Amino acid sequence: DDSIKIRYKRNLGLRPYQKIILQLSIALIVAFVVYKNELIRGDLYIPFTKNTVSLGWGVIPLVVFIFIATTNSVNLTDGLDGLAASTTLVYMAGIAAIIAIVAADADKNGLSLYVKEYQGLLTVCFATVGSLAGFLLFNCFPAKIFMGDVGSLALGGVVACVSILGRLSLYIPILGVMFATSAVSDIIQVVHYKRTKRRVFLMAPFHHHLQKKGLSETRIGFLYSTITGIVALICVLTLI
């Protein structure tokens, strides 16, 4: 995407359909790996419990949808200085806490293979949190560095993959409520405008609506991170 912008000196980069094709290709690979993995198969944790539900081969279309939806939702959230980075940082810290609880439960039940799997995911979580903390020093308002699509789409992929491989896919719309808000508000705005020629929000995604209402970029970032943090705390407390 960046190389196209530099080589052809245009801001377009990859076209939307090209990005979707690439995302779909990666999503299918992830779905196949998940389905073939003996430790995952079609099992998913039911939110707020330590119980799992098995979807069998049905996990394949679910993983494909979740991967593409999550990747683009995080990308849509990257509209203000530090917003996507701070929200993702809190999300990854929250999902790490949930993974740690699940890993401890697996260790208690003598499931050592699951424990090793979760330890690997925790390493990715901590690495992502540390990277984002350093990045935010330069990306918070006023930003000196911008992640662009190469950053936000990658972050979305990490959020999706860690959650999926941890059998925590169903937590994404809950813990990632602010990512979902960005996507849903954008869809509502487009669909409603095409039908009525009127806007539901002053501007979409929702963080731009808040900006139009007079909230500063710093306050919006704090709001998104706080809400994500509160939801993460609720998720963790229900599992303890």
Model-derived segments and their meaning:
Residues 3, 28-37, 42-44, 49-51, ...:
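Alpha-helical transmembrane segments
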Residues 6-22:
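Membrane-interfacial loop-to-helix junctions in multi-pass inner-membrane proteins
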